[in-house]
């Protein structure tokens, strides 16, 4: 299944609504990842030795992913970015299971951020966008390994 224009519109419309609070939403997203899988904290080089009190909202890497779409206004990812993401994920030792953790955290975070917009169609749109991105990153991980 491809990413349809309707799905792209749902993702972009919900992102428009969330981007004004993207830093706070990014913080909630990362905290949700660590709630689901505490060991995931070790995947982030800037968090490895940080203890329990991590000021994620002040760290640019924590919010970088959530703000890229705001800056570009586009859901497409450049090939060079995918290569970098693949290499970074291989270096960090990211396993397939973590992609599901991130997907769950992403969907939970979006649902909480835009409850008035949330619907089965929006969930499906974000799932499709994430699944395509995750598949592309995994493909680049295979090449980088």
Curated annotation (Swiss-Prot):
Catalysed reaction, written as an equation: Fe(III)-heme b-[protein] + nitric oxide + H2O = Fe(II)-heme b-[protein] + nitrite + 2 H(+)
Cofactor(s) it depends on: heme b
Name of a matching Pfam family: Globin
Binding site for heme b: 45, 59, 61, 84, 88-89
Site location (Homodimerization): 123
Record's subcellular location: Cytoplasm; Nucleus
Cofactor note: Binds 1 heme group per subunit.
SUPFAM superfamilies, per the entry: Globin-like
Alphabetical keyword list: Cytoplasm, Heme, Iron, Metal-binding, Nucleus, Oxidoreductase, Oxygen transport, Transport
Sequence motif Homodimerization, location on chain: 35-39, 96-108
GO molecular function: heme binding; metal ion binding; oxidoreductase activity; oxygen binding; oxygen carrier activity
Self-association and partners: Homodimer.
Protein role: Phytoglobin that reduces nitrite to nitric oxide under anoxic conditions (e.g. during flooding or in waterlogged soil). May not function as an oxygen storage or transport protein. Has an unusually high affinity for O(2) through an hexacoordinate heme iron because of a very low dissociation constant.
PANTHER family cross-referenced by the UniProt entry: LEGHEMOGLOBIN-RELATED, OS05G0517600 PROTEIN
Protein name, as recorded: Anaerobic nitrite reductase NSHB5
Organism field: Oryza sativa subsp. japonica (Rice)
UniProt lineage: Eukaryota, Viridiplantae, Streptophyta, Embryophyta, Tracheophyta
Gene encoding the protein: NSHB5
């Amino acid at each position: 299944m491809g990413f349809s224009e309707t799905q792209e519109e749902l993702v972009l419309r919900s992102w428009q609504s969330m981007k004004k609070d993207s830093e706070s939403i990014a913080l909630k997203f990362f905290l949700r990842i660590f709630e689901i899988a505490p060991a995931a904290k070790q995947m982030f080089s800037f968090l490895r030795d940080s203890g329990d009190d991590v000021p994620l909202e002040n760290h640019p890497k924590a919010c970088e992913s959530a703000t890229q779409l705001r800056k570009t206004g586009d859901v497409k990812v450049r090939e060079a970015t995918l290569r970098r993401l693949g290499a970074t994920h291989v270096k960090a030792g990211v396993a397939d299971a973590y992609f599901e953790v991130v997907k769950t955290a992403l969907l939970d975070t979006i649902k909480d951020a835009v409850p008035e917009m949330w619907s089965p169609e929006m969930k499906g749109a974000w799932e499709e966008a994430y699944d395509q991105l995750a598949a592309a990153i995994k493909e680049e991980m295979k090449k980088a390994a």
